[in-house]
């Protein structure tokens, strides 16, 4: 099984690449979706957020007010660290279970779409690591257009993350998403060919069929050894 890491920066276009993988038939584990699930009303993640930030971050129906919580953590680095620390175990567990379900289905290649791939050290479990990159001016412009925020707000949100240029330097594959959608799709095809190459022996060993084969061969070997000893 090949675990492909996919990350980028806010408004870099990572979701576009993630959707292209899905459209190509490659399963994607989306950490943002996992994160939303682990903070639903009544969950352990929800309880930790309420304990740390109070009822001010709740909507009338008791769900987390994501916009309000975002305003708080993007303007205060310490509170952002608190939030990440509280939710990291829940999100990691959620990602693990999504991977396990796909492993049981026999999927050979799985993309992990994780905004905090480097921050959570999950890049160590993925190869290749793909970073979707744009220059800062484009990133600010797209973020302002998408979210209707001011330039200052856009810069604050960008600065709240690891520098995209640093992520780029750590990547195995970089997708420059500064151009048009058609240009990005063309670049994606090369990336798709790369991640769809035959699995290495280590990756085959991690796959469902590979592990099954190892267990069966080991069991047969043990039985034969016991027979020879009798």
Swiss-Prot record:
**Which family would the database say this protein is a member of?**
Belongs to the CoaE family.
Which residue intervals define the domain DPCK in the entry? 3-206
Question: Which annotated residues bind ATP?
Answer: 8-15
Give the CC-aspect GO terms.
Answer: peroxisome
What does it do? Catalyzes the phosphorylation of the 3'-hydroxyl group of dephosphocoenzyme A to form coenzyme A.
Keyword terms of this UniProt record: ATP-binding, Coenzyme A biosynthesis, Kinase, Nucleotide-binding, Transferase
UniProt catalytic activity: 3'-dephospho-CoA + ATP = ADP + CoA + H(+)
Query: Known EC number(s)?
Result: 2.7.1.24
Q: Which SUPFAM superfamilies does the UniProt record give?
A: P-loop containing nucleoside triphosphate hydrolases
Q: Which HAMAP family match?
A: Dephospho_CoA_kinase
Phylogenetic classification of the source organism: Eukaryota, Viridiplantae, Streptophyta, Embryophyta, Tracheophyta
- Keyword Signal assigned to the entry: answer is no
Protein's UniProt name: Dephospho-CoA kinase
Q: Pathway it belongs to?
A: Cofactor biosynthesis; coenzyme A biosynthesis; CoA from (R)-pantothenate: step 5/5
Q: Which GO terms describe its molecular function?
A: ATP binding; dephospho-CoA kinase activity
* Nucleotide-binding listed as a keyword: yes
Question: Which GO terms fall under biological process for this protein?
Answer: coenzyme A biosynthetic process
If you read the UniProt record, what top EC class would you report for this enzyme, in one word? transferase
């Amino acid at each position: 099984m090949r675990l492909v890491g996919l990350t980028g920066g806010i408004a870099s276009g990572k979701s576009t690449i993630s959707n292209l993988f899905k459209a190509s038939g490659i399963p994607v584990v989306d950490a943002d979706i996992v994160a939303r699930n682990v903070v639903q009303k009544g969950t352990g993640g929800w309880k930790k957020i309420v304990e740390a930030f109070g009822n001010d971050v709740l909507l009338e129906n008791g769900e987390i007010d994501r916009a309000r919580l975002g305003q708080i953590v993007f303007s205060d680095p310490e509170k952002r660290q608190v939030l990440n620390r509280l939710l990291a175990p829940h999100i990691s567990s959620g990602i693990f279970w999504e991977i396990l379900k796909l492993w049981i289905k026999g999927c050979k290649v799985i993309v992990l779409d994780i905004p905090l791939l480097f921050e959570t050290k999950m890049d160590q479990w993925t190869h290749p690591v793909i970073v979707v990159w744009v220059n800062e001016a484009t990133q600010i412009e797209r973020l302002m257009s998408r979210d209707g925020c001011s330039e200052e707000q856009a810069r604050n949100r960008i600065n709240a993350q690891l520098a995209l240029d640093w992520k780029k330097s750590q990547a195995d594959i970089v997708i420059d998403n500064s151009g048009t959608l058609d240009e990005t799709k063309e670049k994606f095809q090369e990336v798709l060919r790369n991640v769809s190459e035959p699995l290495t022996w280590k990756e085959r060993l991690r796959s469902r069929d590979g592990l099954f084969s190892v267990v069966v061969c080991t069991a047969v070997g043990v039985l034969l050894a016991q027979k020879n000893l009798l």
